[in-house]
Design a protein with these regions (language model features):
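Conserved GHKL (Bergerat-fold) ATPase module
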Residues: 1-178
């Protein structure tokens, strides 16, 4: 799926970003997002402009408000760059939440391709975690998906320790879970 960006205030930004299909032989090459300033190519190294967990996305961004001096130290101190980065993260979270709410079965089908981005974003960006906790999914051994809240409600009665804290059981290897 893709995200179209078109912002006029408080900064100018147009672009399109899309999530590539993740395969087992994942290509972790960054530099798949091209940055333009007034339709003139600037760089394909967008660290600092795009949140780190989203640099695996593909696409094109064009903004006259991004400085042509793209040194890392300059970008970290530029307020427009921080606003653009936060806006991109917000738009991605909004689009994912919209997909989850409007068509959950389709979202669940795409989850295996999206989960790498979402989980990495939740670990690296607190603001993204707050938004993504609503639509991040856990998969049980039967292949059914649950949100964090759904999983908590399902397991709260029988998966607590002696202090009453909920214990989450999780594995990435289904080979061993079938014997349990």
């Amino acid at each position: 799926f893709w995200i179209h960006l078109n912002v006029d205030y408080p900064f100018h930004l147009t672009g399109i970003l899309y999530f590539p299909r993740i395969k087992s032989n994942i290509d972790l090459h960054r530099n798949k997002i091209q940055l333009y300033c007034n339709q003139v190519f600037v760089t394909d190294s967008v660290e600092g402009i795009v949140p780190e967990f989203l640099t695996l996305l593909h696409g094109v961004l064009d903004s006259p408000d991004i400085p042509l001096n793209v040194s890392r130290s300059y970008l970290q101190s530029d307020q427009n760059v921080k606003k653009i980065s936060n806006h991109i993260m917000k738009k991605v979270a909004d689009r994912l939440e919209e997909m989850f709410k409007n068509d959950r079965p389709q979202f669940e089908e795409k989850w295996d391709s999206l989960k790498l981005f979402i989980q990495y974003g939740m670990l690296s960006e607190e603001k993204f975690y707050d938004r993504a906790a609503k639509f991040a999914l856990l998969k049980d051994v039967d292949g059914k998906y649950y949100t964090f809240e759904e999983y908590k409600a399902l397991t709260e009665a029988n998966q607590t320790d002696k202090e009453g804290n909920l214990i989450y059981l999780y594995t990435t290897c289904l080979l061993y879970t079938s014997d349990a």
